[in-house]
Amino acid sequence: MLSKLALASTLIPAALACLGYEGGVPTPTASYSNSAPIEIAAGQTFDAGWARYDRGSGACTDGEGGNDDAVFILRSGATLKNVIIGKNQKEGVHCEGPCTLEFVWFEDVCEDAITVRGDSAGDHTWIIGGGAYHASDKIVQHNGCGTVNIINFYAEDYGKVYRSCGNCSSQCKRNVYIEGVTAYDGGDICGINSNYGDTCTLNNVCTDADHPCVLYEGCAGGCEPEKVGYCSG
């Protein structure tokens, strides 16, 4: 399956199969507001048991956020599962290295739902199930250099499901594999930098996006990436 990632800047057409759960955000079993991020150590698993976590009223403010603004920080190889990220947050989940998210839901995205960075070529991050609502910009921001796999995810009212960093200070090739995703009322499913050799593979994706895969001319720091076209294949 992942061998398809070798096809640079490619969109693989496939029969539509809406596999993202369309029943809405699960009902939380409990709610917790924390004054600081929860850190999950390298290689460890945090099962939230369907509780809701946020950062408290007023946490969603304008501008880019950092680790201090996240609800969860996952160290390399950590897993977060069965959790709802509430609307009172600036940043949702930060992965410092490859990570796994299983059935992680975002009620109302403020800046970015998921940021992946610190991963290297050959590393794989997995986002399995779950979903996100009301992401005015990006759901998944990828700043590292590995592969992000998004499987059976649901997105509604969003800017982009996945974006390869357009202006990180240090740039590299990034890969994304997206399968079984359902995405409505939004923009790109994936935005990738063609000049850095990024790849996007879409398989069994159900969406009303006009252009599911968009190509950009990325740049390194202090600049604005330019949209240059659409994927073909």
From Swiss-Prot:
Concerning SUPFAM superfamilies, the annotation shows:
Pectin lyase-like (SSF51126)
Where on the tree of life does the source sit, at the highest rank? Eukaryota
- EC number(s) per UniProt? 4.2.2.2
User: What InterPro entries would the database entry show?
Assistant: Pectate_lyase_PlyH/PlyE-like, Pectin_lyas_fold, Pectin_lyase_fold/virulence
Cofactor annotation remark: Binds 1 Ca(2+) ion per subunit.
Any Pfam family the entry gives: Pectate_lyase
A GO MF annotation of the entry reads:
pectate lyase activity
Reaction(s) the record says it catalyses: Eliminative cleavage of (1->4)-alpha-D-galacturonan to give oligosaccharides with 4-deoxy-alpha-D-galact-4-enuronosyl groups at their non-reducing ends
Q: Is-annotated flag, keyword Calcium? A: yes
The positions making up the signal sequence are: 1-17
Where, per UniProt, does this protein localize?
Secreted
Q: Which cofactor does it need?
A: Ca(2+)
* Residues that carry a glycan: 167
Recite the UniProt keywords alphabetically. Calcium, Carbohydrate metabolism, Cell wall biogenesis/degradation, Glycoprotein, Lyase, Polysaccharide degradation, Secreted, Signal
Q: Name one GO cellular component term.
A: extracellular region
- Cross-referenced PANTHER family, in alphabetical order? PECTATE LYASE F-RELATED
What does the similarity note say? Belongs to the polysaccharide lyase 3 family.
Its biological purpose is as follows:
Pectinolytic enzyme consist of four classes of enzymes: pectin lyase, polygalacturonase, pectin methylesterase and rhamnogalacturonase. Among pectinolytic enzymes, pectin lyase is the most important in depolymerization of pectin, since it cleaves internal glycosidic bonds of highly methylated pectins. Favors pectate, the anion, over pectin, the methyl ester.
**Any idea what this protein is called?**
Probable pectate lyase F
